[in-house]
């Protein structure tokens, strides 16, 4: 389709690469739109850390920002147990990556979570959520790139 739109005589490797990137962004957008409101807010919280290059982030820090975003949008935050369950779901969807850390008996076990998709594609797909919650200062400059 890209080659046709550009009136190219033949399909090049660049057309194929850009076509794949476009399809991947569309799949990410569809996947995010299929999430419920709380899952989208959770993903937005993670994206805000990624915008500040603070990702991957510990699950407890992510939960704190998720609570803040819920408060901004007038929703009651769900439990941290809920968040852990849904982080696993977001990982299965390929939206986030999870690394389990074990610091032994003194440090305990915890998860660090990172965004596993292109930040701008995620922010674009979360446009309605961002409008509902408000624009976090960490993503303000990224949104101007959209």
Residue ranges and their predicted role:
Residues 1-38, 53-55, 73-79, 97, ...:
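C-terminal helical "lid" subdomain and adjoining coupling/linker elements of P-loop NTPases
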Residues 4, 44-51, 67:
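Short, locally clustered residues in the helix-turn-helix/winged-helix DNA-binding domain
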Residues 13-24, 38, 42, 91, ...:
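Short alpha-helical interface patches
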Residues 39-47, 63, 84:
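Hydrophobic residues on short alpha-helical segments
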Residues 53-146:
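Terminal-proximal interaction/regulatory segments of ATP-powered molecular machines
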